[in-house]
Swiss-Prot record:
The gene is rpl31e. The keyword Ribonucleoprotein applies. Pfam families: Ribosomal_L31e. It comes from Thermoplasma acidophilum (strain ATCC 25905 / DSM 1728 / JCM 9062 / NBRC 15155 / AMRC-C165). Keywords: Ribonucleoprotein, Ribosomal protein. CDD domains: Ribosomal_L31e (cd00463). Belongs to the eukaryotic ribosomal protein eL31 family. Disulfide bonds: none annotated. InterPro entries: Ribosomal_eL31, Ribosomal_eL31_CS, Ribosomal_eL31_dom_sf. Gene3D superfamilies: 3.10.440.10. This is Large ribosomal subunit protein eL31. One of its GO terms (molecular function) is structural constituent of ribosome. GO terms for biological process: translation. GO terms for cellular component: ribonucleoprotein complex; ribosome.
């Protein structure tokens, strides 16, 4: 995906503490959806056009499904054709 031209590139701090309100067994899943929703609102793009890098997902899941980070910093790259990538900075 790195071959396309970049329209916009920003680093965003995403608060994930709202995921701790969900059940312990669903926290990591909820954190991924919170990340997708947050980037969707900030970049004004449809949720279906967002691609999350596996390293970002591993960072959320690294301490298990119940103990997620309360916030994380990600790099968001908006491409010309309308898709958005979420990667680690």
């Amino acid at each position: 995906m790195a071959d396309e031209t970049v329209a916009q590139e920003v680093i965003i701090n995403v608060p994930l503490r709202d995921a701790k309100a969900s059940s312990r067994k669903r926290r990591a899943d909820t954190a991924v959806s919170i990340l997708r929703n947050f980037v969707s609102k900030k970049m004004k793009i449809d949720k279906g056009k967002i691609w999350i890098d596996p390293k970002v997902s591993e960072k959320i899941w690294e301490r298990g499904r119940e103990h997620i980070p309360s916030k994380m910093s990600v790099k968001v790259i908006k491409l010309e054709e309308g898709t958005t990538e979420i990667i680690m900075p």
